[in-house]
């Protein structure tokens, strides 16, 4: 069943409200919303340290995936046939953060190779998958359960990159 304009607006706003709320709850900065995509970053304007920022980011992604499953069930119950899926790419690294643009239009955003790698990982991810880079994995491996996906060829990078698929948080023993 195709959605009319008002239904599509409600559908998209419900999704974006849910996901952006999760991003903010975990301390992320919402960079931009492009259609049904949300770009979120951690570490600016406030960083809790590189490792804590990485753990918060991956934890946010896990929470988003769980919330998306609930939204998908709700939409399916409402009779929506084409239910979107979720894919995410996460990388940790240096980038340039600031206001970019012209005197007519400025965006507070981030640029650089690290940002490009996160985008490429998102493109390489399967439906419902969160792919993280080796640099992120090294920071979160004691808190997050992951599977090594091996080397992935990514556009714009001369060598393949090692990627990990996020499973879930590691359960802490009391």
Functional labels for PLM-detected ranges:
Residues 26-27, 31-34, 65-89, 151-154, ...:
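Catalytic core regions of nucleotide second-messenger enzymes
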Residues 54, 64, 110-114:
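A short beta-strand-to-alpha-helix junction
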């Amino acid at each position: 069943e195709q959605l009319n304009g008002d239904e599509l607006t409600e559908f998209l706003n419900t999704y974006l409200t849910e996901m952006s709320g999760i991003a903010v709850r975990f301390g992320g900065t919402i960079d931009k919303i492009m259609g049904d995509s949300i770009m979120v970053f951690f570490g600016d304007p406030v960083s809790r340290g590189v490792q804590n920022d990485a753990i918060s980011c991956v934890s946010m992604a896990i929470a988003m995936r769980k919330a998306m499953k609930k939204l998908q069930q709700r939409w399916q119950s409402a009779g929506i046939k084409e239910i979107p899926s979720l894919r995410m790419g996460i990388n940790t690294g240096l980038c340039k953060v600031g206001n970019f643009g012209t005197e007519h239009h400025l965006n507070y955003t981030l640029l650089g190779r690290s940002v490009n790698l996160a985008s490429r990982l998102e493109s390489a991810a399967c439906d419902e998958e969160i792919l993280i880079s080796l640099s992120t994995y090294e920071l979160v491996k004691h808190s997050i359960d992951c599977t090594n996906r091996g080397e992935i060829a990514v556009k714009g990078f001369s060598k393949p990159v090692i990627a990990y698929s996020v499973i879930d948080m590691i359960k802490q023993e009391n």
